[in-house]
Amino acid sequence: SAIISENNHNSDDSVKYLNSSKFLINVHEGYLKKYVTNLVVNGEVQKSISVIKQNRNKDNSKFFEADLLLLIDNFKKKKFKKNIELLNEFERYSGYGNYEYIIYEVLKDYNDLFLSKKPSLNNDKFGQLSLINQAFQYCYLNQPEAGSVFMNIINSNQGDYSRYLFFHFNNLIKNKDFESVQQISKTINILESSLLIQQSKKWLDESDY
Protein backbone atom coordinates (compact mmCIF):
# COMPACT_ATOMS: atom_id res chain seq x y z
CA SER A 1 0.00 0.00 0.00
CA ALA A 2 2.85 2.39 0.84
CA ILE A 3 4.48 1.79 -2.54
CA ILE A 4 1.18 2.36 -4.36
CA SER A 5 0.61 5.61 -2.47
CA GLU A 6 4.16 6.72 -3.23
CA ASN A 7 3.75 5.95 -6.92
CA ASN A 8 0.54 7.99 -6.87
CA HIS A 9 2.52 10.87 -5.32
CA ASN A 10 0.48 10.70 -2.12
CA SER A 11 3.31 11.02 0.39
CA ASP A 12 0.96 11.59 3.35
CA ASP A 13 -0.81 8.26 2.85
CA SER A 14 2.50 6.57 2.12
CA VAL A 15 3.92 7.75 5.47
CA LYS A 16 0.82 6.45 7.28
CA TYR A 17 1.23 3.01 5.72
CA LEU A 18 4.96 2.97 6.43
CA ASN A 19 4.33 4.04 10.03
CA SER A 20 2.06 1.07 10.52
CA SER A 21 4.69 -1.30 9.13
CA LYS A 22 7.81 -0.16 10.98
CA PHE A 23 8.62 -3.73 12.00
CA LEU A 24 9.88 -4.13 8.42
CA ILE A 25 12.92 -1.99 9.27
CA ASN A 26 14.65 -5.07 10.64
CA VAL A 27 13.66 -7.46 7.86
CA HIS A 28 13.45 -5.43 4.66
CA GLU A 29 16.67 -3.83 3.44
CA GLY A 30 15.10 -0.94 1.52
CA TYR A 31 12.32 -0.14 3.97
CA LEU A 32 14.22 2.33 6.16
CA LYS A 33 15.39 4.36 3.18
CA LYS A 34 11.88 4.51 1.73
CA TYR A 35 10.43 5.46 5.13
CA VAL A 36 12.98 8.24 5.70
CA THR A 37 12.52 9.59 2.16
CA ASN A 38 8.74 9.75 2.53
CA LEU A 39 9.01 11.51 5.88
CA VAL A 40 11.19 14.20 4.30
CA VAL A 41 8.87 14.60 1.31
CA ASN A 42 5.99 14.93 3.78
CA GLY A 43 7.81 17.72 5.64
CA GLU A 44 8.69 15.62 8.69
CA VAL A 45 12.44 16.18 8.49
CA GLN A 46 13.10 16.12 12.24
CA LYS A 47 11.20 12.85 12.59
CA SER A 48 13.22 11.34 9.74
CA ILE A 49 16.44 12.31 11.56
CA SER A 50 15.17 10.71 14.77
CA VAL A 51 14.34 7.50 12.89
CA ILE A 52 17.85 7.41 11.40
CA LYS A 53 19.46 7.90 14.82
CA GLN A 54 17.31 5.17 16.36
CA ASN A 55 18.47 2.73 13.69
CA ARG A 56 22.04 3.95 13.28
CA ASN A 57 23.53 0.62 14.38
CA LYS A 58 21.83 -1.20 11.50
CA ASP A 59 23.53 -1.73 8.14
CA ASN A 60 20.48 -0.49 6.24
CA SER A 61 20.91 2.98 7.80
CA LYS A 62 24.11 3.55 5.82
CA PHE A 63 22.77 5.35 2.78
CA PHE A 64 23.48 8.75 1.24
CA GLU A 65 20.28 10.55 2.25
CA ALA A 66 20.55 9.34 5.87
CA ASP A 67 24.12 10.58 6.26
CA LEU A 68 23.19 13.86 4.55
CA LEU A 69 20.36 14.47 7.03
CA LEU A 70 22.65 13.75 9.98
CA LEU A 71 25.24 16.17 8.61
CA ILE A 72 22.65 18.91 8.20
CA ASP A 73 21.34 18.24 11.71
CA ASN A 74 24.87 18.69 13.08
CA PHE A 75 25.29 21.92 11.10
CA LYS A 76 22.02 23.21 12.56
CA LYS A 77 23.18 22.35 16.09
CA LYS A 78 26.73 23.66 15.40
CA LYS A 79 28.26 20.27 16.16
CA PHE A 80 31.01 20.73 13.60
CA LYS A 81 33.56 18.47 15.31
CA LYS A 82 31.01 15.68 15.31
CA ASN A 83 30.73 16.14 11.56
CA ILE A 84 34.39 15.25 11.00
CA GLU A 85 33.80 11.54 11.60
CA LEU A 86 30.56 11.63 9.64
CA LEU A 87 32.27 13.32 6.70
CA ASN A 88 34.93 10.61 6.73
CA GLU A 89 32.11 8.08 6.37
CA PHE A 90 30.40 10.31 3.82
CA GLU A 91 33.47 10.21 1.59
CA ARG A 92 32.49 6.71 0.47
CA TYR A 93 29.78 8.31 -1.66
CA SER A 94 32.23 10.54 -3.54
CA GLY A 95 32.66 7.84 -6.18
CA TYR A 96 28.92 7.34 -6.72
CA GLY A 97 28.43 10.22 -9.16
CA ASN A 98 28.79 13.96 -9.66
CA TYR A 99 25.79 14.77 -7.45
CA GLU A 100 27.09 12.96 -4.38
CA TYR A 101 30.69 14.03 -4.96
CA ILE A 102 29.85 17.74 -5.21
CA ILE A 103 27.64 17.65 -2.10
CA TYR A 104 30.40 15.90 -0.14
CA GLU A 105 33.06 18.44 -1.20
CA VAL A 106 30.86 21.48 -0.53
CA LEU A 107 29.75 20.28 2.91
CA LYS A 108 33.33 19.41 3.84
CA ASP A 109 34.48 22.90 2.84
CA TYR A 110 31.81 24.51 5.00
CA ASN A 111 32.53 22.29 7.98
CA ASP A 112 36.23 23.17 7.70
CA LEU A 113 35.26 26.85 7.45
CA PHE A 114 33.13 26.73 10.61
CA LEU A 115 35.92 24.99 12.52
CA SER A 116 38.94 26.97 11.31
CA LYS A 117 37.28 30.33 10.53
CA LYS A 118 39.31 30.37 7.32
CA PRO A 119 37.96 30.17 3.74
CA SER A 120 38.79 27.26 1.45
CA LEU A 121 40.55 29.09 -1.36
CA ASN A 122 42.18 26.20 -3.18
CA ASN A 123 39.03 24.45 -4.32
CA ASP A 124 38.06 25.73 -7.78
CA LYS A 125 37.23 22.38 -9.35
CA PHE A 126 33.51 23.17 -9.68
CA GLY A 127 33.81 26.39 -11.68
CA GLN A 128 31.11 28.94 -10.85
CA LEU A 129 29.82 26.85 -7.95
CA SER A 130 33.24 27.09 -6.31
CA LEU A 131 33.21 30.86 -6.82
CA ILE A 132 29.72 31.13 -5.31
CA ASN A 133 30.80 29.10 -2.28
CA GLN A 134 33.85 31.33 -1.92
CA ALA A 135 31.65 34.46 -1.90
CA PHE A 136 29.42 33.05 0.84
CA GLN A 137 32.46 31.98 2.87
CA TYR A 138 33.84 35.53 2.72
CA CYS A 139 30.40 36.79 3.80
CA TYR A 140 30.40 34.44 6.78
CA LEU A 141 33.85 35.68 7.78
CA ASN A 142 32.79 39.29 7.13
CA GLN A 143 35.77 39.84 4.83
CA PRO A 144 35.84 42.62 2.19
CA GLU A 145 36.80 40.19 -0.59
CA ALA A 146 33.13 39.11 -0.71
CA GLY A 147 32.25 42.14 -2.82
CA SER A 148 34.72 41.52 -5.63
CA VAL A 149 33.89 37.81 -5.76
CA PHE A 150 30.16 38.54 -5.98
CA MET A 151 30.79 40.99 -8.83
CA ASN A 152 32.85 38.35 -10.68
CA ILE A 153 29.91 35.97 -10.35
CA ILE A 154 27.31 38.54 -11.40
CA ASN A 155 29.34 39.68 -14.43
CA SER A 156 30.13 36.15 -15.60
CA ASN A 157 29.51 35.39 -19.27
CA GLN A 158 28.79 31.73 -18.43
CA GLY A 159 25.13 32.38 -17.64
CA ASP A 160 22.71 34.66 -15.83
CA TYR A 161 23.90 35.06 -12.24
CA SER A 162 22.15 38.38 -11.60
CA ARG A 163 20.16 36.80 -8.74
CA TYR A 164 23.35 36.93 -6.66
CA LEU A 165 22.97 40.71 -6.59
CA PHE A 166 20.40 40.07 -3.85
CA PHE A 167 23.00 38.37 -1.65
CA HIS A 168 25.60 41.00 -2.53
CA PHE A 169 23.19 43.75 -1.47
CA ASN A 170 22.44 41.94 1.79
CA ASN A 171 26.14 41.70 2.57
CA LEU A 172 26.75 45.39 1.78
CA ILE A 173 23.79 46.47 3.92
CA LYS A 174 24.96 44.26 6.79
CA ASN A 175 28.28 46.11 6.63
CA LYS A 176 26.49 49.48 6.33
CA ASP A 177 28.08 50.22 2.96
CA PHE A 178 25.01 52.09 1.74
CA GLU A 179 26.95 54.16 -0.80
CA SER A 180 28.00 51.03 -2.74
CA VAL A 181 24.44 49.73 -2.52
CA GLN A 182 23.06 52.86 -4.16
CA GLN A 183 25.79 52.94 -6.84
CA ILE A 184 25.10 49.35 -7.89
CA SER A 185 21.34 49.85 -7.68
CA LYS A 186 21.57 52.65 -10.27
CA THR A 187 23.09 50.23 -12.81
CA ILE A 188 20.17 47.77 -12.66
CA ASN A 189 18.01 47.54 -15.77
CA ILE A 190 14.52 46.81 -14.46
CA LEU A 191 13.26 45.43 -17.78
CA GLU A 192 16.02 42.82 -17.92
CA SER A 193 15.96 41.84 -14.24
CA SER A 194 14.23 39.05 -12.34
CA LEU A 195 11.36 39.79 -9.95
CA LEU A 196 13.73 39.29 -7.00
CA ILE A 197 16.13 41.95 -8.30
CA GLN A 198 13.28 44.29 -9.27
CA GLN A 199 11.87 44.11 -5.75
CA SER A 200 15.35 44.54 -4.27
CA LYS A 201 15.90 47.68 -6.36
CA LYS A 202 12.54 49.07 -5.23
CA TRP A 203 13.52 48.57 -1.57
CA LEU A 204 16.94 50.10 -2.17
CA ASP A 205 15.61 53.11 -4.06
CA GLU A 206 13.23 53.71 -1.16
CA SER A 207 16.14 53.18 1.29
CA ASP A 208 14.03 50.47 2.94
CA TYR A 209 16.90 48.67 4.67
Task: Report each predicted region and the residues it spans.
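Long, low-complexity, polar and repeat-rich extracellular regions
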Residues: 3-6, 78, 137-139, 166-167, ...
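Mid-chain, structured segments of secreted extracytoplasmic proteins
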Residues: 29-73
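Residue-level signature for tetratricopeptide repeat
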Residues: 4, 37-38, 73-74, 107, ...
